[in-house]
């Protein structure tokens, strides 16, 4: 069972108990590092269609003509891909997509579905129409790895679009996706082993780096280009000496900040996007408009202004325990004005 923010608060009250009882509580659960600060969300989405552990990963699509009309694509891994406006209202639901992770580059949306192709996994490729803000399915790409997580990358060197499906076995694949109109040609260009289970990933066009979250270990940094091989460095670790708590989940960037979600401690670490230096840790607490983000899987962020609601950008987190205030019930996604974070770290 994840150590939620509410549970963590109740555990802290145990310090008033006798020393022996408090010691039992302290040794029964992993130590949780304190956050540097909390922020609150101003918007939350409608709950996903399925109950239980269903919502997982958000991806932001910025409208090319009117950023206030941007949308968020969210996965419901029990059987739907959903599209929300910036007020959190559902605009579209695509049934039958068991995507666990999703990412966007330009007008191309790709989800990683580990139940597709008879359980072997596939990438579902869509195009988003700016006029309707709806997704159109283009192609399913069976993958060699059982696609669990995915991120996209538009190479500054070649202009080519790449997808990186990855799996709970630790295998990572790189696919070139040539999208022309409604036609998609997919070519596998790299395959490597990152170790144990991976899921969260982020490919950064600003520095050519591919960030991979090995859930129980930490975040690795590879080269994003297809010829980069398997050389890697470690951004940060779980456990002693690191700032992350397993499971290492979502990874996203906005402006000069890189964010990583630690599912086991219900918080988010922040790094300098250029140097990789650790900057701090924050949580998303309950506020007037929405409850907190707990047991978070995926995250996304952008520093692009999205109209009056998010003039300096937005940070989005999946909430594994959706309660009051606001909508409650099935899991959903919370929207935090980005400056509430970047003004403090």
Where do the model's predicted regions map?
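Sequence/structural signature of beta-propeller domains
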Residues: 2-9, 32-345
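Secretory targeting and sorting signals
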Residues: 1-33
């Amino acid at each position: 069972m994840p150590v939620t923010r509410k549970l963590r608060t109740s555990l802290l009250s145990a310090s008033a108990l006798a020393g022996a009882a408090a010691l039992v509580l302290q040794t029964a659960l992993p130590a949780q590092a304190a956050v540097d600060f909390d922020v609150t969300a101003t918007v939350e989405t409608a709950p996903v269609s399925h109950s239980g552990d269903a919502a997982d990963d958000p991806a932001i699509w910025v409208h090319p003509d009117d950023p206030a009309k941007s949308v968020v694509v969210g996965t419901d891994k029990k059987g739907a891909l959903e599209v929300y406006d910036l007020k959190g209202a559902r605009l579209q639901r695509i049934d039958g997509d068991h995507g666990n992770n999703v990412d966007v580059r330009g007008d191309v949306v790709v989800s990683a579905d580990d139940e597709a192709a008879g359980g072997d996994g596939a990438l579902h490729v869509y195009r988003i129409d700016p006029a309707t803000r709806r997704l159109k399915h283009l192609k399913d790409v069976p993958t060699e790895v059982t696609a669990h997580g995915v991120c996209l990358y538009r190479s500054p060197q070649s202009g080519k679009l790449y997808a990186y499906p990855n799996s709970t076995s630790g295998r990572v694949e790189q696919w070139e996706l040539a999208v022309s109109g409604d036609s998609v040609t997919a070519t596998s260009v790299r395959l490597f082993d990152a170790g144990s289970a991976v899921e969260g990933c982020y490919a950064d066009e600003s520095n050519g780096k591919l960030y991979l979250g090995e859930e129980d270990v930490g975040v690795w940094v590879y080269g994003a280009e297809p010829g980069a091989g398997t050389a890697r460095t470690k951004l940060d670790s779980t456990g002693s000496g690191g700032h992350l708590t397993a499971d290492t989940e979502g990874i996203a960037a906005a402006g000069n900040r890189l964010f990583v979600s630690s599912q086991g401690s219900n918080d988010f670490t922040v790094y300098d996007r250029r140097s990789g230096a650790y900057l701090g840790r924050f949580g998303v607490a309950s506020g007037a408009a929405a409850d907190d983000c707990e047991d978070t899987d995926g995250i996304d962020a952008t520093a692009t202004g999205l109209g009056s609601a998010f003039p300096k950008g937005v940070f989005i987190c999946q909430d594994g325990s959706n309660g009051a205030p606001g909508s409650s019930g099935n899991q959903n996604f919370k929207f935090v004005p980005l400056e509430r974070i970047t003004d403090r770290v």
